[in-house]
Amino acid sequence: MLKIILPTIMLLPTALLSPAKSMWTNTTMYSLLIASISLHWLTPSYYPTKTLTLWTGMDQISTPLLVLSCWFLPLMIMASQGHLQHEPHKRKRMFISTLIIIQPFIILAFSATELMLFYISFEATLIPTLILITRWGNQPERLSAGIYLLFYTLISSLPLLVSILYLHTNTGTLHLPIIKLTHPNLPASWTSLLSSLALLMAFMVKAPLYGLHLWLPKAHVEAPIAGSMLLAALLLKLGGYGIMRVTLLMEPVSNFLHYPFLTLALWGALMTSSICLRQTDLKSLIAYSSVSHMGLVIAASMIQTQWSFSGAMILMISHGLTSSLLFCLANTNYERTHSRILILTRGLQPLLPLMSVWWLLANLTNMALPPTTNLMAELTIMVALFNWSSPTIILTGTATLLTASYTLYMLLSTQRGTLPSHITTTPNSNTREHLLMTLHIIPMLTLILKPELISGTPL
């Protein structure tokens, strides 16, 4: 565990002390090295928990997310080079340092076996994200987006702290393996019901559940590209991961608590997919599609069967890769046309023909075309939901149909059509951007061959 955390922390002096010329190269290469070392976590082990220390441990649920978070640091650094090139050197250092500071906290959050440590690292990721959005966003609205992000997350996570303390007074420990072994039965009272609700609520806002999702499109639209990638690929997954961890602790008080959340998540998947069909802003469209996919993850985590957990796990990883790739593609368009409006950036296929290949691949994975892992995940979740209650197939089926519709709408409106007259000169796509897209696509394609690496089954 430490052989990843310590080098990640040492990236900070690397970024601060590197000479101006080689700063980007040093940080990117070093973080890629850390990412490739982290791949060995995926080796299957006989024991349910790998590398168990007093405060961290990894099992089937956290390992894929940990590898994903290590994989995304070099990608975020690579994606940010374009829009930071005109900034003073000191600000570039600050930007890279902010990205690096988030990383140990995310790794701690995914590997913590102690609920209090999990809470602290869960909250600590918020501040650097806020700095990224409010300092490096493009429009003045970034300040209101930052306030939305801060208040939604803080208001929901204060009750989480209280309910963790309540759990501690009742069980005497917050160590997850011990809690799992002892199966503490909380007394069936109003306080335990409220505390289980508070435990769930913080993660529902982070995931986000439909109705509590208003901070997400704002944050995505106003964030710089690294902020969008971080939110889509890692911070939303903290919500899904927290739900998976916490639902196993709250039996049997909260069983009937799951019904409203399940219904709302599935209804939200349907509603946000239909909202996507009416979007004019490209980044906003991708952000709403994230809400729709995470709705399925929440619904699956609420059922708590092996199949549904497995489906939720695969969907979280594949959605992280897909939506991050879509944000990168949207950013390459934005850097050339300086507009996110779909009508003003249409018909780019003749100008950037190779980029349209990436657009096609990203959109096909987003609409869960076979044989992608997105399809495996959606099928697994649908089967689990159908097994639990057959009418859910109406909601999930319609949501899938709408997903395909808005994905095709996004592809056709960005790539096809007549070129707007105001786009006169477009810089060519460069190697860095193609490498960035390739490093998103390679994990997607390799996971098709071996999806059991990410189909975490809670042991």
From Swiss-Prot:
Pfam families with a match to the protein in the record: Oxidored_q5_N (PF01059), Proton_antipo_M (PF00361)
BP-aspect Gene Ontology terms: aerobic respiration; electron transport coupled proton transport; mitochondrial electron transport, NADH to ubiquinone; mitochondrial respiratory chain complex I assembly
GO molecular function: NADH dehydrogenase (ubiquinone) activity; ubiquinone binding
Protein location: Mitochondrion inner membrane
Catalytic activity: a ubiquinone + NADH + 5 H(+)(in) = a ubiquinol + NAD(+) + 4 H(+)(out)
Ranges that cross the membrane: 28-48, 60-80, 100-120, 147-167, 197-217, 224-244, 256-276, 285-305, 309-329, 341-361, 384-406
Superkingdom, taxonomy of origin: Eukaryota
Keywords from the named record: Electron transport, Membrane, Mitochondrion, Mitochondrion inner membrane, NAD, Respiratory chain, Translocase, Transmembrane, Transmembrane helix, Transport, Ubiquinone
Free-text function comment from the UniProt entry: Core subunit of the mitochondrial membrane respiratory chain NADH dehydrogenase (Complex I) which catalyzes electron transfer from NADH through the respiratory chain, using ubiquinone as an electron acceptor. Essential for the catalytic activity and assembly of complex I.
PANTHER family assigned: NADH-UBIQUINONE OXIDOREDUCTASE CHAIN 4 (PTHR43507:SF20)
Homology family: Belongs to the complex I subunit 4 family.
Protein name, entry field: NADH-ubiquinone oxidoreductase chain 4
Organism: Gallus gallus
